């Protein structure tokens, strides 16, 4: 009944006819069930859209501004939360800097402060020289 066949150097056993029939029947039943289910979902979608579309058209002058308002409110709360977190982070950094705990970036701040102070001193000295020279003449 089951013969050994050779394909590509490998032995392959033919399956009995009853096994093939069961596999085919299972595939047809599963495929048919899924096809029927897909058709029912499509029909329900069409019926739902047909009944809901007039309501969307009637209420769209209310729904569109409501959606925009809700979106803006959500973005506003998100932005305020982000700004709050940023403010807390900055205040924590300032507290650590003032208490001498040397937060990240403190060296850069000190370097920039010293450069700014030296430039301000140079400008002050230059201004004093100019005014003393103008008063002498």
Curated annotation (Swiss-Prot):
Tissues expressing the protein: Expressed in seeds (at protein level).
Swiss-Prot/TrEMBL GO biological process terms: lipid storage; post-embryonic development; reproductive structure development; sexual reproduction
Keyword annotations of the record: Acetylation, Allergen, Lipid droplet, Membrane, Transmembrane, Transmembrane helix
Claim: Acetylation is one of the keywords in the record: yes
Entry-linked InterPro entries: Oleosin
Modified residues (N-acetylalanine): 2
Main location: other
Membrane association type: Multi-pass membrane protein
Cellular component GO terms held in the UniProt record: extracellular region; membrane; monolayer-surrounded lipid storage body
TM spans (from-to): 27-47, 55-75
Subcellular location: Lipid droplet; Membrane
Function per UniProt: May have a structural role to stabilize the lipid body during desiccation of the seed by preventing coalescence of the oil. Probably interacts with both lipid and phospholipid moieties of lipid bodies. May also provide recognition signals for specific lipase anchorage in lipolysis during seedling growth.
Family to which the UniProt record says this protein belongs: Belongs to the oleosin family.
Full protein name: Oleosin Ara h 11.0102
Species: Arachis hypogaea (Peanut)
